[in-house]
């Protein structure tokens, strides 16, 4: 706390010491409050006048600011003297009306002067490139008038401190303040550069102060009054600053002691007659410069070395004065190291608090988008005021420090734990809010297109061409020394525009004129073209890749089989029934897999994941809580060992009742000739052997009859399930046939809840085996919502009255034909009235839209991989390998999926924005290479490729039939229904 002893104020000898003690005590309390505010990064400055004492209290920056504003202190003391004198005068004598009017004028002049002074400070800050108020150095400007020019003042009025203007001038300045501006021409010169010896002497007499020391005497000139015995002499005022508070900097950050004392100079010493600084250095008088300057020097004033550094040579030749000026450059490395360390600390803090909230012991990942989407059910308490909860990478250094200071108070509040089970796909732009997100998507799409056009143009210029050419981004990443780009903004690497966000895209466009492509080895680009357009020339690489991935898959398969056998207590390896594990994750699962790798068949994995599994094979462990689920999938010899060792009842697995507990995969085992339940019961041992057929290694012969019987049975089961749920929604006990056309035409009034993720509501005849099995596993959650029962009943009556006699039979589901759904549509199309014809036209329109979208995607994908013709899109491969293929230009709210997953409205929007859609192959994946090779081998069989592209709308079966017609020798993999 700084205390100023001054004789300017009238002293009363009768004043009791108690009153002085009370004031001192209260100022100490105010000082403590300032320290607490400083810990929260708030800045305070306070000047108190009590009789003969002046107190300066506040935070470090607040005191520094007040100490630099000597005129402010002088005005405040002068104001207090005048106010006390006015109060005494008013108390002793009654003022006349004229005196009152004069008092009002004085107050008005004082107010106008303060307003003009604030506006001058604003204009000076604006001239320095700041949007905040910066104190005007009046003495320097008057001493060195050519350094800063002031425009817009009235003719004949020179620039000076507002206290020297009269009332008319003040009013004119405020009325025409829009025309007033400050122009900084050069930095201020040293006092000895001027000829005025008087000024030099005055400046020399004014001592330089250390931040923690005492200020020199302040000359305060007071106005004389009738009753005050104060003369016109200058009263000496001594200002004492309080010492630095070491506790304020008790929070130590790693790497905070390795810095210079530049910040100290920026905060305290700048205003102390430092006339040698550059113009940018003047901005350090503004408290907001703390954001930039503080990030450069990282230690508190009390812990900084006291050595001064000579500044770099300024634009104007000046003699160096190492004791007075501290000019330095921004140290990016130091700032980057500090902010990276702080963000890491905050990230670890958030993860630790989040783990405590969900009671998790291991490492956790915070779903930040979920917290932003469900602010009422998921939020964080205890964050400093004004700081929202976001990723630490979005905070700057001040906020990161405040968060760490408040780490004990931070707490994650999770009201609905079920929200944490949501997948990341739920948070994408599937259902964006209208307005902001659509505007953002349109903006980023436009910017990416502009940057892509810019890159193509610059790339063509580097090749000596005037026409834009597509940029081979992969080659630039592969050969950074021979192919690179100059002129990009700082810290922005050269990549495909689809990698950039809006800020980087805007920066690239701003510097578009200076961007230059450097191509030292043009033959690399020629080689790239041949690689893309003629993949057959690179067959040795593909063969090496095929050999490598085949070997790794076989190795992982052997590891899984061995670990599975160990879990069952067997010594010999046993084939793992992967679908059974997928269907029963509660009783059958695998522990110890590398992070981020789910348990699936090795044929799903690429080389990186296979290698990670092999490296961590020692940690892998199979957990089989219910062996009876897998017994039926083991060879007879192995099954008997399991029966004697693992199970309590030996005969249980061989009974027909136990087989009913096995998931619906058992349908695959039943041959198409098993028409009666008795036959299936008798052939139970045969089924046990045959049940291993779907899980044999790839390359075995695919049984179309078994697949056909299974998918037919599953479709019938799902249709019966839908009919039962529809009847329940109407409050009926019997099943009601679902009018699918009504659900498609009025999705707001008729819809279905509880379907598995990614499975739309459609006719069961359009689904493949995976979706049918998902629906049956999720049947308990499925619920039909019918908001208009009267419309529903009318549609049912019209449908039943117009159709031929019911076709319901009590025969076994396995007797149904294979393509019954399609045949039914054809029959109904001939026999039903006009209303149903309209419904069927919608179904036909949806089919046509799917074909058009599929053709569009195939054409764009073919362009992306360098083909001159459409290529079938591997939707499943793109989905399970995120980041390999990026699809830009999709409409807002529509994510990239197979056309069979898309709604009609989404497909129409995709076709409307067809010209903006673009596939970008970031890195190849196994399916992409195999697909290219497959297309090359079948170039002469154009119709076959076209058929497969058209058939993708109905999902798997059609594709599998086409592949099957080529002979079983070409089938190297399991049937992949959704590829």
Swiss-Prot record:
TM helices/strands, residue ranges: none
Gene3D superfamilies: GTF2I-like
Biased composition (Acidic residues): 283-298
Chain positions of cross-link Glycyl lysine isopeptide (Lys-Gly) (interchain with G-Cter in SUMO2): 35, 86, 92, 94, 130, 140, 185, 219, 221, 306, 324, 334, 361, 416, 431, 437, 469, 475, 507, 542, 641, 645, 651, 661, 696, 797, 808, 842, 845, 860, 872, 972
Residue spans of biased composition, Pro residues class: 308-318
Family from the record: Belongs to the TFII-I family.
Descriptive protein name: General transcription factor II-I
Phylogenetic placement of the source organism: Eukaryota, Metazoa, Chordata, Craniata, Vertebrata
């Amino acid at each position: 706390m700084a205390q100023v002893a001054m004789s300017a104020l009238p002293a009363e000898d009768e004043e009791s010491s108690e009153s002085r003690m009370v004031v001192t005590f209260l100022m100490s309390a105010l000082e403590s409050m300032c320290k607490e505010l400083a810990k929260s990064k708030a800045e305070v400055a306070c000047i108190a006048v009590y009789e003969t004492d002046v107190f300066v209290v506040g935070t470090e920056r607040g005191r520094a600011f007040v100490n630099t504003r000597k005129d402010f202190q002088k005005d405040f003391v002068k104001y207090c003297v005048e106010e006390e004198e006015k109060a005494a005068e008013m108390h002793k004598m009654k003022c006349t009306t004229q005196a009152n009017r004069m008092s009002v004028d004085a107050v008005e002049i004082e107010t106008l002067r303060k307003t003009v002074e604030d506006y001058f400070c604003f204009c000076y800050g604006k001239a320095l490139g700041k949007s905040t108020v910066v104190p005007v150095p009046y003495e320097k400007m008057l001493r060195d008038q050519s350094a800063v020019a002031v425009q817009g003042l009235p003719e004949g009025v020179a620039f000076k401190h507002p206290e020297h203007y009269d009332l008319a001038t003040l009013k004119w300045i405020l009325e025409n303040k829009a025309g007033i501006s400050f122009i900084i021409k050069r930095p201020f010169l040293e006092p000895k550069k001027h000829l005025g010896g008087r000024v030099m002497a005055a400046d020399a007499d004014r001592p330089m102060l250390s931040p923690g020391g005492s200020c020199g005497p302040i000359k305060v000139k007071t106005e004389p009054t009738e009753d005050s015995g104060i003369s016109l002499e200058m009263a000496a005022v001594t200002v004492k600053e309080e010492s630095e508070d070491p506790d304020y900097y008790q929070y130590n950050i790693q790497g905070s002691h390795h810095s210079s004392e530049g910040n100290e100079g920026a905060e305290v010493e700048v205003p102390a007659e430092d006339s040698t600084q550059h113009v940018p250095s003047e901005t350090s008088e503004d408290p907001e410069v703390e954001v930039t300057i503080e990030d450069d020097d990282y230690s508190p004033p009390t812990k900084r070395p006291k050595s001064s550094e000579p500044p770099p040579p300024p634009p104007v030749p000046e003699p160096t004065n190492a004791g007075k000026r501290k000019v330095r450059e921004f140290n990016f490395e130091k700032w980057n190291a500090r902010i990276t360390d702080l963000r890491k600390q905050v990230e670890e803090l958030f993860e630790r608090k989040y783990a405590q909230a969900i009671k998790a012991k291991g490492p956790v990942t915070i779903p930040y988008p979920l917290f932003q989407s469900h602010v009422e059910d998921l939020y964080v308490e205890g964050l400093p005021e004004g700081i929202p909860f976001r990723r630490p990478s979005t905070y700057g250094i001040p906020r990161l420090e405040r968060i760490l200071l408040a780490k004990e108070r931070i707490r994650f509040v999770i009201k609905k734990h079920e929200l944490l089970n949501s997948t990341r796909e739920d948070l994408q732009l599937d259902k964006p809010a209208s307005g902001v997100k659509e505007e953002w998507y349109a903006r980023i799409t436009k910017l990416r297109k502009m940057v892509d056009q810019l890159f193509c143009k610059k790339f063509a210029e580097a090749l000596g061409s005037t026409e834009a050419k597509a940029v081979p981004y992969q080659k630039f990443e592969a050969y950074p020394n021979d192919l690179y780009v100059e002129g990009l903004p700082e810290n922005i690497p050269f990549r495909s525009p689809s990698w950039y966000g809006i800020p980087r895209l805007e920066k690239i466009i701003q510097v578009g004129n200076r961007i230059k492509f450097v191509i030292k080895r043009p033959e690399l680009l020629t080689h790239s073209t041949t690689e893309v357009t003629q993949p057959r020339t690179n067959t040795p690489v593909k063969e090496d890749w095929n050999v490598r991935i085949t070997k790794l898959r076989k190795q992982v398969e052997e590891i899984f089989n061995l670990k599975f056998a160990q879990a069952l207590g067997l010594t010999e390896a046993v084939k793992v029934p992967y679908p059974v594990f997928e269907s029963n994750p509660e009783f059958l699962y695998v522990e110890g897999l590398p992070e981020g790798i789910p348990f699936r068949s090795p044929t799903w994995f690429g080389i990186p994941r296979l290698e990670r599994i092999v490296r961590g094979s020692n940690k892998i462990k199979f957990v089989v809580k219910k062996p009876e689920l897998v017994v039926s999938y083991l060879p007879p010899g192995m099954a008997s060992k399991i029966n004697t060792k693992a199970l309590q009842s030996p005969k249980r697995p061989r009974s027909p009742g136990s087989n009913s507990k096995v998931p619906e995969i058992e349908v695959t085992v039943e041959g198409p000739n098993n028409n009666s339940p008795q036959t299936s019961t008798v052939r139970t041992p045969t089924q046990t052997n045959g049940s291993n057929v779907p899980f044999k290694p790839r390359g075995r012969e695919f049984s179309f009859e078994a697949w056909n019987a299974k998918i037919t049975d599953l479709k019938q089961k799902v249709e019966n399930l839908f009919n039962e749920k529809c009847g329940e929604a109407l409050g009926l006990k019997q099943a009601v046939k679902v009018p699918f056309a009504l659900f498609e035409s009025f999705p707001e009034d008729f819809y279905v809840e509880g379907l598995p993720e990614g499975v739309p509501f459609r006719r069961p005849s359009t689904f493949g085996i995976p979706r049918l099995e998902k629906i049956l596993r999720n049947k308990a959650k499925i619920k039909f919502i019918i908001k208009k029962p009267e419309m529903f009943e009318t549609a049912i009556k019209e449908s039943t009255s117009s159709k031929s006699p019911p076709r319901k039979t009590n025969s076994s589901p396995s007797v149904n034909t294979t393509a019954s759904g399609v045949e039914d549509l054809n029959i109904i199309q001939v026999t039903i009235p006009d209303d149903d014809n309209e419904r069927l036209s919608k179904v036909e329109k949806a089919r046509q839209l799917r074909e058009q979208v599929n053709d569009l995607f195939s054409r764009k994908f073919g362009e992306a991989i360098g083909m001159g013709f459409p290529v079938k899109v591997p939707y499943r491969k793109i989905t399970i390998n995120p980041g390999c293929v990026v699809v830009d230009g999709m409409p807002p709210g529509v994510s990239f999926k197979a056309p069979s997953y898309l709604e009609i409205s989404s497909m129409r929007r995709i076709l409307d924005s067809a010209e903006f859609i673009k596939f970008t192959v970031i890195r190849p994946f196994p399916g992409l290479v195999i697909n290219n090779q497959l297309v090359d081998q079948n170039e002469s069989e154009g119709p076959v490729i076209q058929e497969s592209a058209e058939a993708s709308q109905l999902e798997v079966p059609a594709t599998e039939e086409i592949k099957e017609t080529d002979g079983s020798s070409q089938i190297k993999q399991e049937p992949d229904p959704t590829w």
